[in-house]
């Protein structure tokens, strides 16, 4: 799918980013460790700073983390700039189609809430499940560990922002 015409390809790209703590730390953190459903950019930044200070041995600039949050929100959230300004700044990322992050009704906050994600192809969900189990070297995994993570590992439920019912439905 060289032109990203299949929504499944975009879901796969999201999974590859959200499950990679080494190369996509901010995205991994957001989808696996940040569980606040409505938040401001500043709240997200404070949480990321806390996560990085606990998990990364090298010091990271606050400006770098602020830029990371801005990039993440632009990658996953629909542009609000309308037709003003530079055309490239008004273009949305393909990841916006997944509707994993949206602006709140006030416009000053963001939302990232679990839903049923009917547009998540079962093939991508299955691939993510097999990859997770292979990476953990497991033949079985409890549903609660698929839903949430407590030890900075990947959780399919939070990575795809699924409700518990949606996760169980996809497993069936």
Regions found by a protein language model. Name each.
Residues 1-172:
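Donor-sugar nucleotide-binding helix/loop cap in glycosyltransferases
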């Amino acid at each position: 799918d060289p032109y990203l015409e299949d929504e499944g390809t975009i879901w796969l790209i999201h999974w590859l980013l959200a499950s990679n703590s080494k190369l996509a730390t901010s995205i991994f953190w957001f989808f696996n460790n940040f569980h606040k459903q409505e938040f401001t950019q500043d709240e997200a930044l404070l949480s990321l700073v806390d996560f990085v200070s606990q998990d990364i041995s090298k010091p990271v600039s606050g400006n770098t983390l602020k830029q990371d949050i801005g990039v993440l929100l632009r990658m996953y959230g629909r542009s609000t700039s309308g037709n003003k300004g530079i055309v490239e700044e008004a273009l949305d990322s393909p990841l916006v189609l997944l509707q994993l992050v949206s602006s709140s009704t006030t416009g000053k906050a963001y939302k990232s809430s679990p839903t049923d994600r009917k547009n998540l192809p079962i093939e991508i969900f299955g691939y993510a499940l097999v990859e997770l189990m292979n990476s953990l070297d497991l033949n079985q995994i409890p549903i609660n560990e698929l839903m949430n993570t407590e030890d900075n590992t990947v959780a399919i439920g939070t990575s795809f922002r699924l409700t518990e019912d949606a996760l169980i439905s996809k497993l069936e």
